[in-house]
A protein has these predicted regions:
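N-terminal membrane-targeting hydrophobic helices
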Residues: 1-173
Length: 173
């Protein structure tokens, strides 16, 4: 899936976990939660890439939407939670960094980085749900449905964990 969807999922993971951390928590507990958040980010990448999907955003749209999500969320989340959200994002994008960045840099910038065998199973043809070329109508519908499910799930998780945000509810009167 586009990086924007991996990032949205990571924000939902990180913000939900942020609600489970208290300032008074032991350092060991905070570190354990951070490690878990990173691993959940990596695992979410596998789940999303395993779903049948097309890429609704080209590279520029993906870059702009991903950057916007991160900038906006860093502005509205409580400052003490920012690192946890960045850890979740790192976990969610590290599979692409490891498996795709050397190839992409070689292709687009003419570098000569070694291109190793893909580490993550969901980046192999048999493990990826990536749809390319001529896509059957049923597969396109499945892709759209999967994107809607991901966005809906993340939106609900972000709403339920909104106490991690700096936003204050309006007071009546």
């Amino acid at each position: 899936m586009n990086v924007a969807f991996h990032t949205l999922t990571a924000l939902a993971i990180g913000q939900t976990a942020a609600c489970r951390i208290d300032v008074a928590d032991r350092r060991g507990r905070r570190v354990a939660i951070a490690i878990l958040v990173f691993l959940l980010g990596v695992m979410s990448h596998g789940v999303l890439d395993g779903l049948p999907h097309e890429y609704p955003f080209k590279w520029l749209g993906d870059t702009v939407s991903t950057t916007s999500l991160v900038v906006i969320w860093m502005a509205i989340v409580q400052p003490r939670h920012r690192v946890l959200l960045l850890i979740a994002i790192a976990g969610a994008v590290v599979p692409d960094v490891i498996d795709h960045v050397p190839r992409d840099l070689n292709r687009h910038l003419g570098t000569h980085l070694p291109e190793l065998t893909k580490l993550f199973p969901w980046h192999h043809p048999g493990g990826s749900g990536s749809l390319s070329g001529t896509v059957a109508p049923d597969a396109r519908i499945a892709s759209i449905a999967n994107h809607i499910i991901v966005v809906t799930f993340c939106t609900v998780m972000l709403w339920l964990s909104r106490r991690a945000l700096r936003l204050r509810p309006a007071t009546g009167g």
